Amino acid sequence: MQTVRMTTAQALVKFLNQQYVEFDGKQQKFVKGIFTIFGHGNVVGLGQALEEDAGELEVYQGRNEQGMANAAMAFAKQKHRKQIMACTSSVGPGSANMITSAATASANNIPVLLLPGDVFATRQPDPVLQQIEQTHDLSISTNDAFRAVSKYWDRINRPEQLMTAMIQAMRVLTNPADTGAVTICLPQDVQGEAWDFPSYFFQKRVHRIERRLPTKASLADAVEMIKRKKKPVMICGGGVRYAEAAEELKQFAETFHIPFGETQAGKSAIESSHPYNLGGIGVTGNVAANTIAKEADLVIGIGTRFTDFTTASKQLFQNEEVEFLNINISEFHANKLDALKVIADAKEALLALIDELQEIDYQSSYTVEIADAKDAWETELSRLHNIRFTCQDFTPEVEGHFNENLNEYVDALGTQLTQTAVIGQINTLLDKDAIIVGAAGSLPGDLQRMWASRKPNTYHMEYGYSCMGYEVAGALGAKLAEPSKEVYAMVGDGSYQMLHSELVTSLQENKKINVLLFDNSGFGCINNLQMGNGMGSFGTEFRYRNQETRKLDGAIMKIDFAASAAGYGVKTYHVTSLEQLQEALIDAKKQTVSTLIDIKVLPKTMTNGYESWWHVGVAEVSKNQSVQAAYESKVSNLQQARSY
């Protein structure tokens, strides 16, 4: 047997260079590159291996471990899970910073390979710098926290363990049914230890992502169910995008006259203008999709996880005859809502159903309902685009909260811009193939409802975990995946302040991204939630501490985000009017460096809910009568929802 004497880290790098995926006959490198933040826990081990021979891996320098791991996840998401980035950090706080990203990737079923440094396997120098000592179990380190949020976790305590660990890592990373974060913990001493690795460990490995076919039995059951139903609705989930099944879904909708709503992950699989595309569905959905869904007698989920935002906490579907048909590559997700399961690739399942349903000349019973619902939404959308603030008698979209306070915000922020009008203009002015990236706050709701996707795969929303601070890093990842397209991070001031470090990495890599920062001086989405459930405004506006009351009810904070970003070398713009916004967007397209447009918008001018409910933990007992009323409303809505 031929062997090669290498360190564990050197063997890992060599192995990663030999991984390929094949999908529909097309073969490509699986691991594009690796994000690094070096510290004592990885620099002389994995860092040395990368310096000596990185092979074809592109080595990137991150600024924050969570930021770079978010960028790696976004890269894989934009690549439809067919190519990934790895991430390496030092031990302790560096690795802990990636835990949130691991959870984000696993929640979204997006592959990302995390390689955190770890404490010494020999324990000779214990406690090493940045080590936690657990007196009840000395084998525990910070990296054990990854177990809860990883789809596969391993620790390499001996060099020879690397082989089985990495084989299993690749199994999970290339498994469309159960992929997510894979964490391989690398004790810093073991990284540098040498071993005689067999040459066959480094052979070229092609991981074929196969399309699972539906069984004849499940297909027959699905046909029997569909043919009994008159008004079915489909839900286009992220699985439609990852399976590249958009054309088949369109064919299915057109052939059988069945409309579909979009989840956040599924949006832009098919352009918004398609006659059967109702748009966003659920809590952050629009009136068209939710109205049709409420009356549907069959819900066909295609590649969706049926989160509470998609099902409106299982209260959206009100037809007493409603049943569920779930097409999913994952048995776990297909099993939800007592559905009839078709465990299969979305494309293959749709093609098989088309053939079977054409045999019986199936057609839904919709007449004008689909067109009427879309027309009603277009009318509402036009209204949202044209909302303008007036100092007197202005009623915001989220009314009854700040009606008397809005003029204070007008003065403090120097703006009269409404959020819906800003989104409308942005949607009009961006290139058709531009990619928008979002994750948290009020913007995901506005974008799922309002954004018209004009080209496929241009809507990139991380809403499986809704990770605050994902947006800027996500934009960098999307840009690395599609460097020829303009990429825009759609981010609120709250999420931006949590994390935007990879904006600097975009400058370093000359990968231009555009940050559209909506500043309403607060956590506006959560302010809506608390006040909508009977509370006052508490800890969600960005106000100075009042020296008299000792509470955060002083003057509104105004932050010059443009000035801050300009210090990095970003091209920046201040916007307080639609005219300035248009000028900034046009000029930003001409730039070759990353840009940031600081857009001051008024609170409460985002969209509100349409025909949906969200189950949150309202206080059962309170001295506040408004909270008591909110609890009673929750109980009433819960009675109309499925129990599971």
Curated annotation (Swiss-Prot):
Residues where thiamine diphosphate binds: 65
UniProt-listed PANTHER family: 3D-(3,5_4)-TRIHYDROXYCYCLOHEXANE-1,2-DIONE HYDROLASE (PTHR18968:SF9), THIAMINE PYROPHOSPHATE ENZYMES (PTHR18968)
Catalysed reactions, as listed in the record: 3D-3,5/4-trihydroxycyclohexane-1,2-dione + H2O = 5-deoxy-D-glucuronate + H(+)
Native source species: Bacillus anthracis
GO biological process, alphabetically ordered: inositol catabolic process; isoleucine biosynthetic process; L-valine biosynthetic process
Keyword Hydrolase carried by entry: yes
EC number(s) reported in the record: 3.7.1.22
Protein name according to UniProt: 3D-(3,5/4)-trihydroxycyclohexane-1,2-dione hydrolase
Pathway assigned in UniProt: Polyol metabolism; myo-inositol degradation into acetyl-CoA; acetyl-CoA from myo-inositol: step 3/7
Family matches, as PROSITE patterns: TPP_ENZYMES
Recorded name of the encoding gene: iolD
CC cofactor: Mg(2+); thiamine diphosphate
CDD domains linked to this entry: TPP_IolD (cd02003), TPP_PYR_POX_like (cd07035)
Annotated cofactor note: Binds 1 Mg(2+) ion per subunit. Binds 1 thiamine pyrophosphate per subunit.
Annotated Mg(2+) binding sites: 493, 520
Family annotation (HAMAP family): IolD (MF_01669)
Keywords tagged on the record: Hydrolase, Magnesium, Metal-binding, NAD, Thiamine pyrophosphate
SUPFAM superfamilies, per database record: DHS-like NAD/FAD-binding domain (SSF52467), Thiamin diphosphate-binding fold (THDP-binding) (SSF52518)
Summary of the function given for this chain in its UniProt record: Involved in the cleavage of the C1-C2 bond of 3D-(3,5/4)-trihydroxycyclohexane-1,2-dione (THcHDO) to yield 5-deoxy-glucuronate (5DG).
Chain intervals for the UniProt region annotation (Thiamine pyrophosphate binding): 442-522
